[in-house]
């Protein structure tokens, strides 16, 4: 499987990392590590996570209140968004 990250998701990830690093030293790195683990799980088990629409799935991070929204087409996983669950609950 090939992972692609949309520009929107990339900026959301960077914003979250920056925010967490301002809260506590290296917390942003911990966020990114949790995100990478979740992306690896998506890559290894792309159909594990539930559909929220016909073609979009959601994976919830383990340690942070964020969800990864992605689509699966053939051998490409496209990460559309990495959204905070409380700030954007109906994202």
Which residues fall in each region the model found?
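A beta-hairpin/wing motif
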Residues: 58-60
């Amino acid at each position: 499987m090939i992972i692609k990250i949309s520009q929107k998701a990339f900026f959301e990830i960077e914003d979250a990392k920056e925010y967490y690093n301002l809260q506590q030293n290296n917390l942003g790195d911990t966020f990114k590590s949790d995100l990478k683990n979740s992306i690896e799980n998506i890559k290894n088990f792309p159909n594990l996570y539930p559909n929220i629409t016909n073609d979009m799935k959601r994976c919830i991070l383990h340690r942070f209140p964020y969800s990864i929204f992605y689509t699966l087409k053939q051998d490409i996983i496209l990460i559309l968004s990495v959204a905070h669950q409380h700030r954007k609950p109906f994202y």
